[in-house]
Amino acid sequence: MKPGIHPEYGPVVFRDRSTGTQFLTRSTATSEERVEWSDGNSYPLIVVDVTSASHPFWTGGRQVLDTQGRVEKFRRRYGDRARGGQ
């Protein structure tokens, strides 16, 4: 790889918002928020809505996610225009 043009790639903890499950992996994503991991080190924390711990495809079940906030945000942003301008 050419030096100086690629983002830094390091350890990051991803936390599933709905289940609280945490995954330590590597990513170019960063965060100011940090979390203490079981190895005693502190890593950047990124909170995500869906992971393999909560997605129905991976869990084999059906889990209702909180989409009310998304729907309300959409309605505030687009209002009646979303219904075809009626």
From Swiss-Prot:
Record-level GO BP terms: translation
Keywords: Ribonucleoprotein, Ribosomal protein
PROSITE patterns tied to this protein: RIBOSOMAL_L31
Pfam families registered for this protein in UniProt: Ribosomal_L31
Disulfide bonds: none
GO CC annotation terms, alphabetical: ribonucleoprotein complex; ribosome
Any GO molecular function: structural constituent of ribosome
Alphabetical list of SUPFAM superfamilies matching this protein: L28p-like
InterPro entries: Ribosomal_bL28/bL31-like_sf (IPR034704), Ribosomal_bL31 (IPR002150), Ribosomal_bL31_B (IPR027493), Ribosomal_bL31_sf (IPR042105)
Family: Belongs to the bacterial ribosomal protein bL31 family. Type B subfamily.
Subunit structure: Part of the 50S ribosomal subunit.
Record's protein name: Large ribosomal subunit protein bL31B
